[in-house]
Amino acid sequence: MAKEKFDRSLPHVNVGTIGHVDHGKTTLTAALTRVCSEVFGSAVVEFDKIDSAPEEKARGITINTAHVEYNSNIRHYAHVDCPGHADYVKNMITGAAQMDGAILVCSAADGPMPQTREHILLSRQVGVPYIVVFLNKADLVDDAELLELVEMEVRDLLSTYDFPGDDTPIIIGSARMALEGKDDNEMGTTAVKKLVETLDSYIPEPERAIDKPFLMPIEDVFSISGRGTVVTGRIERGIVRVQDALEIVGLRDTTTTTCTGVEMFRKLLDEGRAGENCGVLLRGTKRDDVERGQVLVKPGSVKPHTKFTAEVYVLSKEEGGRHTPFFKGYRPQFYFRTTDVTGNCELPEGVEMVMPGDNIQMTVTLIKTIAMEDGLRFAIREGGRTVGAGVVAKIIE
């Protein structure tokens, strides 16, 4: 059978399962593909295939992640599931699998556990915007009051981390029943169908990169005699058109300039779009006014900052990271988009040191400004060697 063509007509949404070990994330993932294949006609992926997730590298960090896809009536979903807790931590911090929404799987028989809490916190830190809850293994709970209690606990936990706990949709069911094609008390296939409908209605369609305000990290600067200065890079989002006013942000004071041409593969174009590698010709900007590591943006859309809180994963020795812990006052380089900037690390109160393989919240103060927004990913390096990965959780100044 020929490989089916990717259907671009349905809007594309990225989701993933999160939650404590053995609460049924992978079973639910398999059940979702099964139910959607019966109802909406996408492909089935078996449990074993998801569970033995392949290794992949993101920013030099090895992560095991399973990617499956399924369709609802109105959308195409790309879904990630990780076998181990460490894989979730790395995945969410590196942004290897960006989620537009997460499905929190919590066992109704056990209630919220340490990783339930940790994954909700991580979702908050890395900017997962929406969480839908699937209370799993409900077929093992006879007592309706117990179900209510677990539901209340989960809602409280979500509210603790600034998710709308009271309004979060919670679907009660059994992933295993759905996987086996059963549906007693509508806990099997019906519950999973309801989950998909909830994803459709509760998670808004994400804004496409091309519709966001223009941003291009500057990789290189050239001066072309008689034409002016050209900066090159890959457009991260938005569109740049000839005659657009632009700002150059980061590393020095912000300056304004105008785009007088867009060049791609030696051809002149009227515009450059998200995802394209191109050169942008700037009017009135000297070769020495711009450098790699700055960003070219739509005026007013991004501000330069130096101080922020971050969620960081420190590479283990096996991953090629440090062999020893680091302490407060640690000063590595932070690699944002295209450049390294030195920064100072403040650890949370009561934390003396950070071991390789840990994840930690820290406050970072950079020695130069960087154009940044909440959710921006970075690498931590020592002399060009990656020793950690992080994400901006909240900008301070």
Swiss-Prot record:
Q: What is its EC number?
A: 3.6.5.3
Q: Where is this region: G5?
A: 174-176
InterPro entries in UniProt: EF-Tu_GTP-bd (IPR041709), EF-Tu_GTPase (IPR050055), EFTu-like_2 (IPR004161), EFTU_2 (IPR033720), G_TR_CS (IPR031157), P-loop_NTPase (IPR027417), Small_GTP-bd (IPR005225), T_Tr_GTP-bd_dom (IPR000795)
Cellular location(s):
Cytoplasm
Similarity comment: family membership: Belongs to the TRAFAC class translation factor GTPase superfamily. Classic translation factor GTPase family. EF-Tu/EF-1A subfamily.
Return the HAMAP family for the record: EF_Tu_B
* GO MF, one example: translation elongation factor activity
- Say where the protein is mainly found: cytoplasm
Q: Which residues bind GTP?
A: 19-26, 81-85, 136-139
Q: How does it assemble?
A: Monomer.
Region of interest (G4), residue spans: 136-139
Lineage top rank: taxon: Bacteria
Residue span(s) of domain tr-type G: 10-207
Could you list the residue ranges that cross the membrane?
none
What's this chain's function?
GTP hydrolase that promotes the GTP-dependent binding of aminoacyl-tRNA to the A-site of ribosomes during protein biosynthesis.
Q: What class of enzyme is it?
A: hydrolase
This chain's protein is named Elongation factor Tu
> Known catalysed reaction(s)?
GTP + H2O = GDP + phosphate + H(+)
Residue span of region G2: 60-64
